[in-house]
Amino acid sequence: MNVRIIKGDDGHDKIQVRLDLGVLQLEFNGRPDGERVGDHESWLEHYQARQREHDQAHPDGPPLMLESEDCLKLLREGVQYYHRYLSFWNLQRYELCARDTARNLKLFAFVREYARHDREKLQFDQWRPYVTMMHTRAVATPLAELRDFPAAIGAIDAGIESIRQFLIDYDQLHRAEECGELQQLIHWREETVARQTGVPKIGTSVKSVESLRAELDIAISEERFEDAARLRDEIRRISGGIAPGQM
């Protein structure tokens, strides 16, 4: 991902992302495109305020439901935050990546509760494991770098539990081994415990392949193709020349 920080015409820092079809420029704070929705920072805050007002006016009535056009606005806005938190991750601005991933997780929870149609709930919530993994990485990475391993492991455990809860919510816990985001956090936890104790993991070679495959899935989803190629080569080396079943 080709991303850098530049000074904008207003003197404030901006994120500049170079894409195949051009350059994307994002604000550091507020909505990434710099726009506002009336008196609110974002469509999410706008609909949250409307929901509170509705609840106060109709305390015993049904909640105000999000219609399809509302969800579309929230989805497009959520994609902006996705581009920004990936940019912050690549810039190693972990605290800002954690801020934006937490924001999108709140978005998913809001849509899950108030969207009228199940198809729109799933359209958002399908990304919960990925964003949870990214949030966990953003929180735990600087802690591990500071060698605060208990705090890092606690953050990883919280991420693992959140993804497991997602699988429980959809009656898919029996497929936990197929969830790349969950497996990556589990293996990262093992590696972090090994760093803390100085004791290598048992069965390192087998688990390394599983961990690398999970990383490969993430690299492809983030369009980090050079990293993906490197990971494929490493998997082939460890597996004795057998290529993984990805593209």
Q: Can you annotate each of these PLM segments?
A:
Residues M1-V111, D157:
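N-terminal alpha-helical interaction modules that lie
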Residues R84-F88, Q92, M133, A138-L143, ...:
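Conserved small-residue packing positions in alpha-helical repeats and bundles
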Residues L74, Y81-Y82, D100, P129, ...:
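TPR repeat positional signature
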Residues P63-G78, E120-T132, Q196-S208:
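TPR-adjacent "capping" and linker segments in tetratricopeptide-repeat scaffold/adaptor proteins
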Residues V3-D9, K14-E27, G34-E35, D39, ...:
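N-terminal cationic and glycine-rich segments that engage phosphates or anionic surfaces
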Residues C97, N104, V111, D118, ...:
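Alpha-helical solenoid scaffolds that mediate protein-protein interactions
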Residues L66, E113-P129, I168-E181, M247:
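Acidic, Ser/Thr-rich low-complexity linear motifs
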